[in-house]
Amino acid sequence: MAMASPAIGQRPYPLLLDPEPPRYLQSLSGPELPPPPPDRSSRLCVPAPLSTAPGAREGRSARRAARGNLEPPPRASRPARPLRPGLQQRLRRRPGAPRPRDVRSIFEQPQDPRVPAERGEGHCFAELVLPGGPGWCDLCGREVLRQALRCTNCKFTCHPECRSLIQLDCSQQEGLSRDRPSPESTLTVTFSQNVCKPVEETQRPPTLQEIKQKIDSYNTREKNCLGMKLSEDGTYTGFIKVHLKLRRPVTVPAGIRPQSIYDAIKEVNLAATTDKRTSFYLPLDAIKQLHISSTTTVSEVIQGLLKKFMVVDNPQKFALFKRIHKDGQVLFQKLSIADRPLYLRLLAGPDTEVLSFVLKENETGEVEWDAFSIPELQNFLTILEKEEQDKIQQVQKKYDKFRQKLEEALRESQGKPG
């Protein structure tokens, strides 16, 4: 015998989930109302345990009748505060919690085991007397005032006490690879002749109209879209190319992350974040392009180049030369730290065969006598006087020998016919 299904509204069975039928009736009678937001009373309400006892059923029916199946009205909630742009991506750290690792640190790889470790081998050091005044140690970066050691092969210069700390091998062990120019230098013609050029006479500064005419003429001859731009205040900007001809090693910080866009904009000095240093040889005749102003001096150009390569050596260790090709010869002239390279570029034109800039070691720097004490200066005078007396004695001995040979020849010729 089939059991007839109960009609809507009848309860022939003792259902315990009594809140559901009213919602079911509401769905049949009209559109379903949205459920009320949970409030504190509903969150703290603990449901009674299920029971089939008649007393429990009657008590539950009485409580439902007293409530009248009325639900409390929803409490007015405060509107959500709108988030500022980029705030949802921000992570909050507990005070004192360790700072997470920089995402760029995942690119730092350990040293390749296939690369052999250098131990400072292959150098042939000899004592050096700096002819042009004090020099710079390639290991510690400090100034060398008196005695120094220099490798006869790679020109590595250091203090005598720094000799045992060198870990960079001599570059001559690599064969002729050190003498080959970099790929960027294949477009330039190199010569082996170096001729000193006399200092040019100072000229009067050009007027604004002359500068404008020279810039227009320069831009018409420039074919690489690297022209100069004139500002309203009379200054102008442009590009120069600097050839790096450094035979001695340079010192850079070790174990730092690459420079980011933020560091470049904020001019963050990453070299100051670590005390670790390492040395290496730059490729010969590498070319670096700089965008400078007409007010940029040679000293600022050198500092900009060192900053681009993250070199921590003293800028006085380097010097900027201008190289001129003329009649198959290469004329080098050291520029003063107050010279304006962009103005020289404007006068010579965009052709690098006429004028080019070279960064080399400052081996012929002027002696800063103010850096020495009185006893040291007196010692220098004593050494110079001794060297002068030695030279005089050598010249005297040389001509004394000539006199003796002439006198012997005259004695032998006496008594002999014609």
From Swiss-Prot:
The coiled-coil regions, if any, are none
Feature: compositional bias, Low complexity: 77-89
Q: Which domain of life is it from?
A: Eukaryota
According to its UniProt entry, the protein's GO biological process terms are:
apoptotic process; lymphocyte proliferation; negative regulation of lymphocyte proliferation; positive regulation of protein ubiquitination; regulation of protein localization to nucleus; signal transduction
Task: Give the matching SMART domains.
Answer: C1, RA
Record function comment: Potential tumor suppressor. Seems to be involved in lymphocyte adhesion by linking RAP1A activation upon T-cell receptor or chemokine stimulation to integrin activation. Isoform 2 stimulates lymphocyte polarization and the patch-like distribution of ITGAL/LFA-1, resulting in an enhanced adhesion to ICAM1. Together with RAP1A may participate in regulation of microtubule growth. The association of isoform 2 with activated RAP1A is required for directional movement of endothelial cells during wound healing. May be involved in regulation of Ras apoptotic function.
Query: Protein name, please?
Result: Ras association domain-containing protein 5
Which lineage ranks, top first, belong to the organism behind this chain?
Eukaryota, Metazoa, Chordata, Craniata, Vertebrata
